[in-house]
Amino acid sequence: MHDQGEFLSCDWGTSSFRLKLVKIAGLEIIAESSTTNGIARTYELWKRMNEPEENRFAFYARNISHQIEKISQQTGRSMDNIPVIISGMASSNIGMIELPYKKIPFKLNGSDLLMQRYAATENFKHDVLIISGISGDQDVMRGEETQITGIENIPSGDWICILPGTHSKHVKVKNGLVVDFKTFMTGEFFELLSTKSILAGSIEKGADPANKNNLSAFEKGIRAGIESNLLHSSFIARTNILFNKLSRQENYYWLSGLLIGAELTELTHLHEYNIVIVGNQEQLLSYKAAFEILNQLAKTPIPVLQDSDKAIIRGQSRAMMNQKK
């Protein structure tokens, strides 16, 4: 890939697209653009075009070009010949090109991840590097593997990396290798329960998670998630309102805490592991609060927190360096 001193970092998820112009020295973000045109929506648009399969890559590349043009306008200069590094769902069966998963174990430095390079063309003047996902016996991920390889100050010994989200990941690391991971549908369950179930009328999103009452409700939900059966305790979100125990906004945070607590129950016995959480600010605050309660109840270690946006950029930069070797 051409070494321009910069690269375009593309994090293309199922429901979101984020593009950043990154200076390689110091990994400084120079400009950025984002849209809700995730892979799922882009794939739907592609299917409507009814074009031959061999045109799919070019169609997706045109969508990237629209966002590159916004970066060009922000910076006042051409982005031609600056490489594009893509992680996320672009390598899935609804993405630009389907790439196989890398079977675990894989190295934390990302040197054995599966990646595919595409040379610049007349119509898309950027070398492209697409990073594929990883798979275990029962689980898969696309995108999180790049965050894992971008973790700073990697703990020594055995440790667990938690990546919160729609489908949270708990990743086990031994001797510099990812050896196992599990998927927890925490975010998706919250979405379903709060919008599609009988609980929907009992929930109202609060504007301030740091509000004293909201935080108290969240912590109570965490304890309930750790200590009780989820299939029973989730119904309490309804009786919280029927019996005037919580407001609808407080109940929103109670239910969120309940599901996070249920997810993290898996970790109550892992006292010998260091724990790293990689997420956005809201996720880090929520999971930090949950682990403080876990520490009180089960002596689970307090985790180290790392920003997911920075981890993505570091992981993509390392992938680009590995590709040059």
What are these regions (language model features)?
Residues S16, Y273-F291, D309:
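Glycine-rich phosphate-binding loops at beta-strand->alpha-helix junctions
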Residues G38-P52, S132-R223:
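Glycine-rich phosphate-binding loop plus the immediately following alpha-helix
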Residues C10-S16, M89, I162-H167, T186, ...:
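A short acidic Gly-Thr/Ser loop motif
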Residues S78-A90, G165, I260, E272-Q281:
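Short glycine-rich phosphate-binding loop at a beta-alpha junction
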Residues R48-E53, E69-M115, L129-D137:
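Short beta-strand-loop/turn "lid" adjacent to the catalytic site in phosphate-handling enzymes
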Residues F7, T14-N55:
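Short glycine-rich, Thr/Ser-proximal phosphate-binding strand/loop in the N-terminal lobe
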Residues R223-E266:
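Adenine-nucleotide phosphate-binding core of ATP-dependent small-molecule kinases
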Residues T265, I302-K325:
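Glycine-rich phosphate-binding/hydrolytic loop that grips phosphoryl groups
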